[in-house]
Amino acid sequence: MARMMRAAAFIEKGRIELVDKPIPDVGPNDALMRITTTTICGTDLHILKGEYPVAPGLTIGHEPVGVIEKLGSAVKGYREGQRVIAGAICPNFNSYAAQDGVPSQDGSYLIPEGKCGAHGYKATAGWRFGNWID
């Protein structure tokens, strides 16, 4: 029998419920995080109002704080039992900023009027990568 977890799931417009879901498997590049605190984001409210088309049963929430329960074999720089935050913005590693090693939180860029930002970026976000949460 699969181990289960509780998750907030979109059921229908105006209705989100806590449901039981199987705990996902951890692949070589994954981390399993036990959520201890999370936020309610504007995205969650848009989903609740039916303004974003999502399938019933979708697990919502994307800005949690928690503890690493299990790490994949290829994950480096973290340890099981460590408190972490999962950011809502993740790079696809195809942008010029990501290919240059700039984290997505710092890879925002401003495009001057009449100019193209396709090949440039300017770090403006101000997040520090690797902050500790205690």
What are these regions (language model features)?
Residues 1-2, 16:
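Short solvent-exposed loop/turn micro-motifs enriched in small/polar/acidic residues
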Residues 2-8:
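Short structural boundary motif marking the start of a folded domain
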Residues 8-16:
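Extracellular beta-rich ligand/substrate-recognition surface
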Residues 18-20:
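Well-ordered beta-strand positions in beta-sheet-rich domains
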Residues 23, 77, 92-134:
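NAD(P)H dinucleotide-binding glycine-rich loop of Rossmann-like/cofactor-binding domains
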Residues 24-38, 48-99, 103-104:
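Glycine-rich beta-strand-centered segment in the early N-terminal region that forms part
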Residues 41:
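Conserved Rossmann-like nucleotide-cofactor binding loop
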Residues 44:
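Active-site phosphate-binding/coordination module
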